């Protein structure tokens, strides 16, 4: 091909890509423009949105068969989320709205989860809620569920299928806002230890990008080191101790996004180092440690709550089954901001420093009904869900 023609073709390709990107951005802006401004603010660039596929969804008759597909029930967070969903669906069963609640667990095997979801389709479930084991591998079976008239609602992570309704936090925004809050706590000057989750995980990449953006906006804060805690207490404590052993300089803040803030504090104490401001997801053991060490635990973060994850899936699925029309396919749930000044409202006497399987109940509903209404055409609260009736962390 002559050099001039090659250059012309290349310029046309670049122009076409730019045009397509611009059109997609315009479509995205128009779609998000249908949401209230408070909800639009929850969508940053990494979040992909499409129109909901359920604008003309045909309502299944009552009583409904509710099916839940779990990808892994092997940690306390997932067990807690599953128990809360079981409680909520159980209340709907008592009211006569649900005939049966079926649960599958693929134990980390995506192929098995696909097979289990196909079984749910064969059993003519009215709705499938899921914590997906893959963002892409379930797309075909989700499309098959849609063709069978079965809506699929994901929580605690999204899938790429346009036939699902995803309910999730914006991990990119969470990582950014937490970092900004931590940096403000130290006056915009100091040293930050970054403790990410599982390196390379899609959610971790989004969280890290949020941290990087906040760091770039705060030139007075320098990154001391970046380590991977893998969202587990033992690994997190080990890598923090290693960092402290090889980084003699002062650490002013620790940014993390998991529920391992208590072991981070313990690592600093073990190393004989002053406690920094620690960020992450609040947990029962962290609140227990705070109560046992008054005045020492400085915190800025939020809570990725298993209770709320289950509640959000239940509420969105219930609205679908009752005829409310989602505007978009990815619903962003707000993340509550929590500091150590708020701990007294979150702490319960049952919380000890070893309460690793205990997750605090937010004092107030972090996703109020009027806010959720903005995601639906004809949005209205469902009487089947009453946040005031959520059991307390320490039981009745």
Label for each model-derived stretch:
Residues 127-146, 211, 229-290, 314:
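Hydrophobic alpha-helical
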Residues 37-84, 88, 92, 102-114, ...:
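Extracytoplasmic "Venus flytrap"
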Residues 135-173, 191, 285-295:
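Flexible loop/hinge segments that line or gate small-molecule binding clefts
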Residues 91-106, 191-194, 212-234:
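Short beta-strand elements in bilobed, periplasmic/extracellular small-molecule ligand-binding domains
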Residues 45-54, 113, 166-192, 206, ...:
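Hydrophobic alpha-helical segments within soluble ligand-binding/sensing domains
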Residues 66-67, 74, 85, 176-226, ...:
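An alpha-beta-alpha
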Residues 26-64, 314-396:
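Hinge/cleft segment of the Venus flytrap/periplasmic-binding protein
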Residues 50-52, 97-124, 226-247, 263:
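Structural motif
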